[in-house]
Amino acid sequence: MRLSLSIIIFLGYLIKPQTGFEIAKMIDEKPVPRSLSNKIEMLMKNSKGKTRKKMIISKSINGGEQQIMWFVKPKTDYGVSFLKIEYEHRHDEMRIWLPNFGKVRRISSKKKGDSFMGSDLSYEDLSNRSLNENEYYRLADDVINNIECYVLDIRPLANLKSSYSKNVCWINKSDLTGIKEESYDKKGKLIKRKFFRYSFLDGYSILTYAYVENIKRNHSTEVFFSDLIINQDVDKKIFNEKYLQTVPFD
């Protein structure tokens, strides 16, 4: 029995491979918690195997669109704090309070490739990737640790100030979480590898671990997220420069 033309067209639509943008859009549309409070431990290791640890208290709303972080350990970093506010149609706002200097420093778009507090994360790495500010190319699917993945080549638009020429991302097909990312500099050279793990809390994918390898520096940073509290009422007033100088009880 022959299928009608309309059915053939419909079935063809269902099995049509998704484009890179369509996959990115599905990721962008995933639900995020209204707020997230947590503690962050950063463990940094240099080329000689020497490690340094930093402890942070973080609060954010709307999937990290607004976030404030206070450093509580080590003692030399106590009181340093960081504020990030993301915008849809203009550059994100980033400020860091440096108590030893008694001033707030604004992180300009030219400085977003700089290291965040000596770690292998840059200020740019701390921002969500805006869907419409990048081009997405779907590469061949891959399998990592028995996890089937989409692979996307993500390139910032020419007018976007980015320290990367592209990021290649491995996306878990089952839950649309990014589990691996490779970042390339402006010359197309691989400079960072990043790996991520998530937990599912009340139906949300929440980042609980990140590993960042800086190939250029032969340096690495592990990031552990703990004491996760979601959808708690968070006063939006704290996402303001004046609250950078007020460290909450840890």
Please report, for each region that a protein language model flagged, where it lies by residue.
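Sec-dependent signal peptide recognition
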Residues: 1-8
